Amino acid sequence: MISAGDLRKGVTFEFDGQVFTVTDFLHVKPGKGAAFVRTKLRNVISGGVVDRTFNPTEKLQEAVIERKEMQYLYSDGELYYFMDQETFEQIPLNAEKVEDAIKYLKENMFAVIKFFKGSAFSVEAPNFVELQITYTEPGVKGNTATNSLKPATVETGAIINVPMFVNDGDVIRIDTRTGEYMERV
């Protein structure tokens, strides 16, 4: 059992006979009245999103989730294909299940696929990835006195804010949990 006050982004639990993953949460302590937890939940089976408010002391049944590392192979436009390294079985997943992880995945990279009762419902990119910058505006000399950032497009198409000294062709490390630039490699 997990209490509603412990809900965080990515936690999966069973509620009202359905399984939900927390996509967003806010713990609210109003000046008057009791505290509550406002959440945005995604149904792992249907993909539907609901807003739900919980009392922080409310107990929820934690769902049993299987996590399996798989290799991202390719995309055919609508579906993304992942391969199990043990059985070599390929699993197609739609964009709704892949979510934001695809912004950081190149072909042949490994990602964690989450399963509930044998059905894949979510993809988790590695915490840190190294990607090459394909386009960014050149930094102007003298612009580096402050900690200013500029947008840069990486090889997967994601746009990341990077420091002024980063140029086209540089390889950078990105924290996929926050989408932030970490360092130049």
From Swiss-Prot:
NCBIfam families: efp, PRK00529.1. Belongs to the elongation factor P family. SUPFAM superfamilies: Nucleic acid-binding proteins, Translation proteins SH3-like domain. One of its GO terms (molecular function) is translation elongation factor activity. GO terms for cellular component: cytoplasm. HAMAP family: EF_P (MF_00141). Keywords: Cytoplasm, Elongation factor, Protein biosynthesis. Involved in peptide bond synthesis. Stimulates efficient translation and peptide-bond synthesis on native or reconstituted 70S ribosomes in vitro. Probably functions indirectly by altering the affinity of the ribosome for aminoacyl-tRNA, thus increasing their reactivity as acceptors for peptidyl transferase. PANTHER family: ELONGATION FACTOR P (PTHR30053), ELONGATION FACTOR P (EF-P) FAMILY PROTEIN (PTHR30053:SF12). This is Elongation factor P. Its main location: cytoplasm. Pathway: Protein biosynthesis; polypeptide chain elongation. It is found in: Cytoplasm. GO terms for biological process: peptide biosynthetic process. InterPro entries: Elong-fact-P_C (IPR015365), NA-bd_OB-fold (IPR012340), Rib_uL2_dom2 (IPR014722), Transl_elong_fac_P/YeiP (IPR020599), Transl_elong_KOW-like (IPR013185), Transl_elong_P/YeiP_cen (IPR001059), Transl_elong_P/YeiP_CS (IPR013852), Transl_elongation_fac_P (IPR011768). Gene3D superfamilies: 2.30.30.30, Nucleic acid-binding proteins.
